[in-house]
């Protein structure tokens, strides 16, 4: 099992959800986050000093079986891409265990 974290532009959420649903991946956690690009864009403040301009983003967290990893990554990349700076990032981690609290199912059965 793998955990995927994807940082995407908010207006791309529905498209990414649809792309993942076509693979049978429907459960995920979505969190509103803010970030700033590698090339920091400064915005004026009341003190006159520039401050990094944080951009609104969404962080998607989902767990997939190993056999769906490549397809899930491809769907996120295809659906979230705008070909502009700051389209986002995808992080993949090995997942040791998943436990569904209600049923106590473990592993892939708990996804």
How would you describe each model-predicted region?
Residues 1-111:
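Positively charged, small/polar-rich N-terminal and surface patches that mediate targeting and assembly
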